[in-house]
Amino acid sequence: AERTVQSGMDFMLDFHYSDFWADPAKQVKPKAWKELSGEALETAVYLHTVDTLKALKNHKLVPTMVQVGNEITKGLLWPDGYIEQTENMAHLLQAGIKGVREECPDARIVLHLDFGTDNKMYRQWFDQVSSYALDFDIIGMSYYPHWNGSLSLLLDNMNDISSRYDKDVLVAETSIGYTTETFGCNGIVYSKEHEKITGYPATQQGQEAFLRDLFATVRSVNNKRGIGVFYWEPAWLPIPDCTWASKSGSKYMKDKMTAGNAMANMALFDENGNANSALINMKTM
């Protein structure tokens, strides 16, 4: 956060509320909260949110956006906050939101789901929580062209949900390969098959072309409700022992993905750490 602010940039803080990555496949309660439930768990969420933001503010580091949960399509803090237990989930979200509003009243709050082209899922999720009057500002969505379909489908969903729920929208995660080389990394995601699916060549020029098209798509959302894009993960270089999870971490989370650097060929830097053209030219997009 300090380096970001020193570089003249704003930042979004993303609370996962877990000891590990949180996404639709895993939303595991922190070990320290394992025995907590109900109001006790809600209080823990609130206090953790407040304490984290206080610590940042003590260093004059104030996020302009705060994401309460990461890819919470199926809920958060399982099993208490499963999406099927909508009331519990909503109360946990409200606890985090309350902490943000108290400590960073000017920060805009983001609720983030995955699969940004799935309009049915977005409608179902936000309709399901509508009766709880969650106090948030922005709907964030993950969009990976090799998994989630076309930019036109993304735009259709953004137009619909921004209007239906009167919220701004942004792409909270995206990436695409600048090569299909694996660099000897275990578990690398992007492949020649993905290159064919996206229609963009797996080159620096293809990566830049995709981002230009994505930026243009978000800018074209009706009523200027599309406000931005976050790239994930721009700086995972193929260096020795770089991994998204240790073996012990994977075992703890019961995650079956191969440990290693899964995103190296989708970074915004090449294998030698030089900025790709997409990053160099981003301000012109």
State each model region's role:
Residues 1-5, 44-47:
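Aromatic- and glycine-enriched glycan-recognition loops and surfaces
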Residues 3-11, 51-63, 95-109, 132-135, ...:
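A structural motif corresponding to the C-terminal end of an alpha-helix
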Residues 4-20, 230-231:
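Glycine-rich, aromatic-flanked loop segments that form ligand/cofactor-binding clefts
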Residues 14, 66, 139, 173, ...:
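Conserved, mostly hydrophobic/aromatic
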Residues 16-20, 68-73, 112-117, 141-146, ...:
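Active-site beta-loop-alpha junctions enriched in small/polar residues
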Residues 23-136, 149-158, 244-252:
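Active-site cleft segment of glycoside hydrolase catalytic domains centered on the general acid/base Glu
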Residues 102-108, 121-197, 203-208, 212-226:
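Glycoside hydrolase catalytic-domain groove-lining segments
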Residues 160, 179-213, 217-225, 230-285:
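Aromatic-rich peripheral "rim/lid" segments of glycoside hydrolase catalytic domains that contact
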